[in-house]
From Swiss-Prot:
EC number: 5.6.1.7
Provenance organism: Acaryochloris marina (strain MBIC 11017)
Protein name according to UniProt: Chaperonin GroEL 1
Task performed by this protein: Together with its co-chaperonin GroES, plays an essential role in assisting protein folding. The GroEL-GroES system forms a nano-cage that allows encapsulation of the non-native substrate proteins and provides a physical environment optimized to promote and accelerate protein folding.
Root EC class: isomerase
Pfam families cross-referenced by the UniProt entry: Cpn60_TCP1
Gene: groEL1
Length: 558
């Protein structure tokens, strides 16, 4: 395909137009009084949204040169979302301001490479300042962070704070769509496995169709069990001990399953069997997790253990096990806490070493199941449009809360960025010549988020910025109540990680745009060029005479 190549000022201006098209659509959502954006969908009702990254992903421009600029801005929002889970609109506003001011200087003859160096060095210094000013998050601050990110929804803020308190910082909190109108939370204590009973004959509560056993023994086997002979020895020992038994195996079939079911129905043995979770190497690892949690051993031929050699000491113990058709929840004894802690540390090290997003997600899940538990927030709303918007807000709030726990909090509402402008002068003292102009660009860009928040609230942004700049570090403008106050005391806080990653990603993309000298894009195809003229095909109408082919029936030579 032919390419369109543009150079110098023309390439940078095309990028800027694309940047502005996307950023102008995103920035109107910033702050507590930000507006909504309606996204047209090819199928179904339009989506009303207030989430920066979702809007950014929908913008596709007709002009390929401008679209390249829009794609770069989309990268700012996506990268910030990946790292911090929130703050995408702030990052977009910062990047737009840096690019706008930077291109003015490049057009006036400034050296783009020196500008980029100045921007990078200044942002590095500001990141250190953010780290120094951040405060650890505790108590009510968790609910405050979640409330701000959920668009000042106090109910959601309290719910997320409660979930974090229940499952701990290693726990997993998931967001699902509810079947009702209310938004509610469900806490699953213990380890939950996505496997249910092998046979419905194992249930102990026929009304709820679940099997519940207490003070149970666990036989954890990394193989398929089909022969009853393999199980006889251990079943006799468990029966003598008078305890219920949960068997976790690759599969259970044939006479082994039939005998267990018969013994269960006759009341000889209280037993339930489930299939092992996961596949391949991950199955082996998850069985080991269960063994550590319950203080048992995995019976595997890989380590020289076979079923005929198993005794009670090798079985795990659980305070309570609940098995439904699809899930099993194991609540372990507190005595195994030391071993569980060591296993969690081992998994954390694996988490730090892996690059795969999928592996990271699975490891995080395993850590949560071992260390804390799982909380599920079920989002309800009157219409599907409201449900989607609410779900996105809750996901943002959840991500912001995790970011706050990771790196602490700073004053919110654009306040921290304004007060960081005071450190620009000390940074400039260490820079050379035109690099200082890069530092000034960052100083101007830092004002953009608060200006936009004030504009969206119907105030004069420039006036608000000057008022906040002259005050203490935690003093800022609360757009929700239209007052100037101590933002941390008022509960208007941002996770330091969100502010940091937004600033870094904005600086990165701005530096790339400023140092662009050429732009290469696909040439749009002329309208109608792809479809050749089919008019000449009209003569095919004469094919009607083929009806005479019926005479071919005489070919029956066989």
């Amino acid at each position: 395909m032919a390419k369109h190549v543009v150079f110098d000022e023309e390439s940078r201006r095309a990028l800027e137009r694309g940047v502005n098209s996307l950023a102008d659509a995103v920035r109107i959502t910033l702050g507590p009084k930000g507006r909504n954006v309606v996204l047209e969908k090819k199928f179904g009702a339009p989506q009303i949204i207030n989430d920066g990254v979702t809007i950014a992903k929908e913008v596709e421009l007709e002009d390929p040169l401008e679209n390249a600029g829009a794609q770069l801005m989309r990268e700012v929002a996506s990268k910030t979302n990946d790292v911090a889970g929130d703050g995408t609109t702030t990052a977009t506003v910062l990047a737009q301001a840096l690019i706008r001011e930077g291109l003015k200087n490049v057009a006036a003859g400034a050296n783009p490479v020196a500008l980029r160096k100045g921007i990078d060095k200044t942002i590095d210094a500001l990141v250190k300042e953010i780290e120094a000013k951040s405060k650890p998050v505790a108590g009510d601050a968790i609910a405050q962070v979640a409330t701000i990110s959920a668009g000042n929804d106090t109910e959601v803020g309290q719910m997320i704070a409660q979930a974090m308190d229940k499952v701990g910082k290693d726990g997993v909190i998931t967001v699902e769509e509810s079947k009702s109108l209310a938004t509610e939370m469900e806490i699953v204590e213990g380890m939950q496995i996505d496997r249910g009973y092998i046979s419905p004959y194992f249930v102990t509560d026929a009304e709820r169709m679940v099997a519940e056993i207490e003070n149970a023994r666990l036989l954890i086997v990394n193989k398929k069990i089909s022969s009853l002979q393999d199980l006889v020895g251990i079943l006799e020992q468990v029966a003598r001990a008078g305890q219920p038994l949960l068997i976790i195996a690759e599969d259970l079939e044939g006479e082994a399953l039939a005998t267990l079911v018969v013994n269960k129905l006759r009341g000889v043995l209280n037993v339930v069997a489930i299939k092992a979770p996961g596949f391949g190497e991950r199955r082996q690892a998850m069985l080991q997790d269960i063994a550590v949690l319950t203080g048992g051993q995995v019976i595997s031929e890989d380590v020289g253990l076979t079923l005929d050699k198993v005794d009670l000491e090798m079985l795990g113990t659980a305070r309570k096990v609940t098995i439904s058709k699809d899930n099993t929840t194991i609540v372990s004894e507190a005595a195994n806490a030391g071993d569980v802690g060591k296993r969690v540390e081992q998994l954390r090290r694996q988490l730090d070493e892996t690059d795969s997003e999928y592996d990271k997600e699975k490891l995080q899940e395993r850590i949560a199941k071992l260390a804390g538990g799982v909380a599920v927030i079920k989002v309800g709303a009157a219409t599907e449009t409201e449900l989607k918007d609410r779900k996105l807000r809750i996901e943002d709030a959840l991500n912001a809360t995790k970011a706050a726990v990771a790196e602490g909090i700073v004053p919110g509402g654009g306040t921290t960025l304004i007060h960081l402008t005071k450190t620009i002068e000390s940074v400039k003292a260490q820079l050379k010549d035109e690099e200082k102009v890069g530092a000034d660009l960052v100083g101007i860009a830092l004002e953009a988020p608060l200006t936009q928040i004030a504009d969206n609230a119907g105030k004069e942004g420039a006036v608000v910025v000057e008022k906040v700049r002259d005050a203490d570090f935690s003093y800022g403008y609360n757009a929700m109540t239209d007052t100037y106050e101590d933002m941390i005391a008022a509960g208007v806080v941002d996770p330091a990680k969100v502010v940091r990653s937004g600033l870094q990603n904005a600086g990165s993309i701005a530096g790339m745009v400023l140092t662009t000298e050429a732009l290469v894009v696909d040439k749009p195809e002329p309208a109608g060029a792809a479809a050749p003229d089919m008019g000449g095909m009209g003569g095919m109408g004469g094919m009607g005479g083929m009806g005479g082919m019926g005479g071919m029936g005489g070919m029956g030579m066989m």
